[in-house]
Structures are given as C-alpha cells and as structure tokens.
C-alpha cells in the first residue's frame, strides 16, 4: 500500500497512554516503512495478549470505547485495512488501566525506533493546518454572520418597500364596473380566436423555395409519423362531427411536415442544375472552348429528357439561367450546337418575353436545319459527345431545327419581316411543307391576314401558287383540321384572283360537302364547329360570281334528301345557324343548276320561308351572310313566280 504525503493512509494503534504521544498526523510512512511496521506491531500485540489474558483487558468496555474515540483526535477515522483485519479475527483490543498501557508503552515505542535520525525536523502538516483553520473559522464566523444578517435585512426592507408601493397603487385604482370587465373578456376571446385562425391560415400558406431550408430532428420526424397514425386510429372511433374536426386538426398538424417532404424532393435537384449551369467561363474569365460548351449543353439536354421532375424544377426556378447559358456562345458553322440551343429554348420558354435579343437571326439559322446537314461529322465534336448527341436525336424522335423554329415562331407575337419572308419560302417548299404540315398550319393561320404577307404574295405570285398547291394537296387528308379550313376561308375571302386556288374549287367543294352530309343530320355537339367551318368554305366557293361548279348527280341527290328531311322534321332551334347555312348553300346550287333543280312549288315555298327567317336573324351580326341571303332570295322568288305562272 502506497502513501503520498500528508493525505496518504496512516497506521493507527489502539493503545493510548496518559502522557502526550506524538500525534498520528505527525507521522508519515513511505512504502517500505509501512511494510516493515505492520509485522512488528502485530507480533507485539500477539505477545502481549499471550502474557496477559484478554479477560483482564475487557473489564471496562465503556471506558475502552471512550478512550478509543478520544484517540481519534481531530475527526480522524482509523485505518480501514487494520480495522478489517481486526474484524476478521473477531478480536477487540481495548486498554483498561494505566498499568496495562505502561506495560505496552515500551513495546509500542520500540517499534518506531527506526524513525529516529531520519530527519532533523518534521513539518507539522495536518495538525497545524487544522488548528489554523479552526482559528480562522472561529475568527471569521462572527463577521460572516454579521454581513449575512445585514444583507438579509436590506433585502427584506426593499421587498417591504415594493410591497407597500404596490398596495398603495392598487388602493388608488378606481372601482371597475362589471360591464367593462365583460367587454374586456369578450375582446380577449375574440383576439384569441383571430390569432388561432391566422395561425391556421398561415400554416396552410407557407411557401418553400430554393433558398429556404429547415432542419428537423429524426426523432421528431418519427414522433410526427406516430402521432399521425394515432390520430387516424382515434378518428375512427368518434362520431361524424368529431371526425370532421379531427381530420381538420390532422391536416393542420401534418401540413408543415408534408411541405418539408415536398421541399426535400425538389431541393435534391438543386446541386445538379447548379453544377450544369456553372463554369460557363474559365478561371481567367475567358470563354470556354466550343467543344466544352457543346458538351455542357448536351448534358443539360439529356438530363431534361431523362428526368421529367428535374425538368419541371429547372424550368420553375432556373429558366432565365438556362436561357442565358444556352446563348452564351453562337456559331453559325456549328449546326449541332444551334439545334441544342433551339431545343432548350423551345423547352423552357413560355412566352415571347423569354426570347433572347438575337432571336430573329438565331431562329432563321435554326430553320436551315432540315436533317440533312447532320450527315457530315463535325470536327468540334469528340467521339463520346458524338455518341451522346446521337442518343439525344433518338430520344427527341429526330426533330429538326426547322420544327423548333416553327414552334418558336408560333409562340412569338409580332414577327419581323425577315421571319415572314423565311416562313413564306419554307411553306412554298412541297417537301418541307408535307413533312411539317402540322406545324406550318397554325403558323399560316396567324400570318395569312398580315399585310406584309399579302403584299409579298402579290409581288411574288409564283410563291403564292406553290403555297395554295401545298394546301390543296393536304386538304383531303386534313378535313378535320379546323386551322386548315380557316386558312382556305381566309384565302377565298381575298379579292385577289388566283388561278391555282380556284382550279381546285370543285374538289374542295365536293370534299367539304360530303363531310357536311355525313354529320349534319343528326348533328352532334362535337361536330358543330367543324361543320360550320365547312359550310362557310362551301358558301364562299358556290356564292362567288361567275362560279361554275361541276358536281356529280349523286352529291345533288344527297343534298336534296337532307333538305327534305330537315324541312319535314322542323327547325332545330339549337342548330339554327347550321341549318340556315345549309339552306343558303342549297339555294346557290339551285341557281347554278337552274332547270335541273327538280323542286316542286311546295318545297320551294318552304325554302323561301326558311331563308326569310334566317335573314332576319343574321342581319344583326353578319352583314356578308345577310347580303348573300338577299341574292339567293331574289333568285328563288323569280323561279317560284315563273313556275306559278307556268302552272
């Protein structure tokens, strides 16, 4: 057992003489000393016990207890190891008289002879320290008690002063009426309700964008999910009213958590899009090489194609950045790059305001890509990028730059004269028009009435003839396309005479009228708009001055059959406009056939009655139709009068 300084263990002896002995605190042991002392003491004790019977030592047990307690000195406990040894032996050694102590005095002191001369003087550590502490404590305790009493007295006086001030303030307050208290309570209740409603409303209106992040503990997340499950289980056992309230509370409590989950699903794309949009310039602020720029746009395009959620996120939050990156560089001799730029602009732009300033020149260059220029291998594209570009073409179904340019022009509001000229050239090309007819038709519908468009075709009639020929070639295959029928109606309304347009008039009228006869009686709601457009186109053709339509007998017979059915079945008020336009077309065909109409006076009279009613209805909103009805009525009245005279 080791001993370290004054705090180390000290060997205690149970013997005590009446004379002053060195205190236990004055004795220190090293490791070797302790090991040598313990056997000597134990041998001495055993020899003394053998000479003197143990009964003699136990005559006065109470005195022995008092002496052992006084031996402890200044609150010292005996050594635990010696006590444990004595307990194991079940032997208690107690001094009972001065004779026994005198007998063992020499024996005890002889055990400490080896300590003589080890040091000239010993430092009194523990005893002196304890006495010093006791003296200091005895001298300081009265002062501390005085200071504590003064502090407590001051605090008590300050508290009493505050208490008196509050009592004085309360006593000075006027007595309040019950009405005032009731109003105050009502206002507080209303305020609580408004705060609760506002908190519910704001919790539902919380918005999360790309710049807001909220941390949530995993344990809290599990608690929320557990609460949701418990909430659903509890609502099943309640009545209908309680169920509705519980559902509202559940929706309110989980609204914030669900918004966090949705925000996490979208923020996961932020690093990807920021990486793709970064490094558009090199470290020295110069433009990156064209092949690296092409690779960056290609990777961004493939990401948009492969991941729809990524595309929606990029379009919502990074639309301007994508357009800016797409037009950071432009090379007219790099058609593959122009195609990628057109694709990205077509995907993310929503209106004309999203287009770059150089849109006119760019779109014209983009329209030159008809798919043939990509047969040559570009020197700017590396092998891996070339393979990725072929993958891009396959996934976009090999759409050309012409397709993207036509789509962008349709979105554009006011087209420049250069773009209109470019559209006219493209539309007059038979091969290009047939391949992109679905894209050309909506664009031509918007341009056909433009003054620049009309003047250009007047100056270049051969281009106008090519356009009309392309429209006629596609007409039979696009009878259900409302935009194509509108274009032909607008062209037939023009006063400019064009031989190419009217030489196909018989074919157009025949195809349109057959479509009308198939659906007009009975007429479904889905077909109303298309049938009205076909009736208007046929009316423009058959009502034209000096019109000489060559129709077969079957078409005339079918028209007469439908006319008779409609007359006998009565007027359908819901489709009055459709019936009136059909009667008007039928009247102009009677005028062209003249003696071959084969109508009896009764049917002719009914036709006159229907046209008169139709004229009164249309005169208020369409002057052109009203004038044509007047022409048809004059002719039919002359026929009806002559037939009555003949009869």
Curated annotation (Swiss-Prot):
The keyword Cell membrane does not apply. Keywords: Nucleus. It is found in: Nucleus. The keyword Nucleus applies. Residues 66-82 have a biased composition (Polar residues). Coiled coil: none annotated. GO terms for cellular component: nucleus. One of its GO terms (biological process) is mitotic sister chromatid cohesion. It comes from the Eukaryota. Residues 1-90 are annotated as: Disordered. Involved in resistance to ionizing radiation. Present with 721 molecules/cell in log phase SD medium. This is Protein RAD61. It comes from Saccharomyces cerevisiae (strain ATCC 204508 / S288c). The gene is RAD61.
């Amino acid at each position: 057992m080791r001993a370290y300084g004054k705090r180390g263990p000290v060997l205690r002896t149970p013997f005590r003489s009446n004379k002053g002995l060195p205190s236990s605190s004055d004795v220190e042991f090293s490791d070797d000393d302790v090991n040598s002392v313990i056997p000597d003491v134990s041998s001495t004790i055993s020899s003394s016990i053998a000479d003197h019977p143990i009964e003699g030592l136990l005559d006065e047990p109470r005195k022995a207890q008092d002496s052992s307690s006084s031996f402890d000195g200044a609150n010292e406990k005996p050594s635990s190891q010696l006590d444990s040894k004595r307990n194991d032996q079940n032997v208690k050694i107690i001094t009972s008289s001065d004779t026994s102590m005198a007998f063992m005095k020499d024996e005890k002191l002889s055990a400490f002879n080896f300590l003589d001369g080890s040091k000239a003087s010993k430092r009194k550590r523990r005893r002196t320290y304890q006495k010093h502490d006791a003296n200091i404590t005895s001298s300081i305790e009265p002062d501390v008690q005085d200071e504590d009493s003064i502090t407590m007295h001051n605090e008590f006086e300050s508290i009493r002063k505050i208490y008196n001030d509050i009592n004085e303030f309360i006593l000075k307050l006027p007595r309040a009426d019950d009405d005032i208290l009731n109003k105050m309570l009502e206002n507080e209740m209303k305020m609580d309700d408004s705060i609760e409603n506002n908190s519910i409303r704001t919790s539902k209106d919380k918005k999360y964008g790309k710049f807001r992040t909220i941390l949530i503990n995993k344990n809290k997340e599990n608690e929320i999910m557990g609460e949701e499950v418990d909430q659903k289980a509890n609502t099943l056992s309640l009545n209908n009213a309680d169920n509705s309230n519980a559902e509202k509370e559940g929706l309110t409590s989980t609204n914030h958590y669900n918004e966090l989950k949705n925000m996490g699903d979208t923020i996961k794309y932020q690093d990807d899009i920021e990486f793709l949009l970064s490094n558009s310039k090199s470290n020295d602020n110069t433009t990156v090489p064209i092949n690296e720029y092409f690779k960056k746009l290609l990777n961004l395009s493939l990401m948009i194609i492969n991941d729809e959620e990524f595309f929606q996120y990029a379009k919502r939050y990074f639309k301007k950045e994508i357009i800016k990156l797409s037009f950071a560089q432009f090379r007219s001799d790099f058609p593959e790059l122009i195609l990628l730029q057109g694709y990205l602009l077509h995907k993310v732009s929503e209106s004309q305001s999203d287009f770059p300033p150089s849109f006119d020149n760019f779109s014209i260059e983009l329209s030159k890509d008809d798919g043939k220029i990509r047969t040559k291998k570009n020197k700017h594209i590396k092998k891996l990028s070339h393979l990725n570009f072929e993958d891009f073409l396959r996934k976009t179904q090999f759409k050309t730059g012409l397709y993207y340019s036509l789509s962008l022009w349709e979105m554009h509001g006011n087209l420049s004269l250069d773009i209109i000229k470019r559209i006219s050239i493209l539309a007059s090309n038979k091969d290009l028009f047939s391949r992109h007819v679905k894209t050309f038709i909506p664009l031509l519908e918007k341009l056909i009435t433009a003054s620049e468009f009309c003047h250009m075709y007047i100056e270049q009639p051969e281009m106008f003839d090519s356009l009309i020929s392309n429209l006629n070639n596609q007409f039979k295959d696009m009878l259900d396309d409302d935009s194509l029928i509108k274009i032909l109606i607008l062209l037939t309304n023009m006063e400019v005479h064009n031989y190419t347009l009217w030489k196909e008039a018989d074919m157009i009228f025949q195809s349109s009228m057959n479509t009308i006869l198939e659906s007009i009686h009975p007429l479904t709601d889905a077909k109303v708009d298309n049938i009205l457009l076909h009736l208007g186109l046929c009316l423009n053709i058959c009502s034209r001055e000096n019109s000489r339509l060559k129709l077969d007998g079957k078409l005339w017979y079918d028209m007469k059959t439908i006319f008779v059915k409609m007359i006998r079945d009565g007027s359908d008020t819901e489709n009055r406009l459709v019936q009136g336009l059909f009667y008007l077309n039928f009247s102009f065909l009677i005028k062209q056939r003249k003696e071959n109409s084969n109508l009896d006076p009764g049917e002719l009279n009914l036709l006159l009655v229907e046209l008169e009613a139709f004229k009164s209805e249309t005169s208020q909103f369409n002057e052109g139709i009203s004038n044509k009805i007047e022409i048809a009525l004059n002719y039919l009245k002359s026929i009806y009068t002559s037939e009555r005279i003949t009869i």
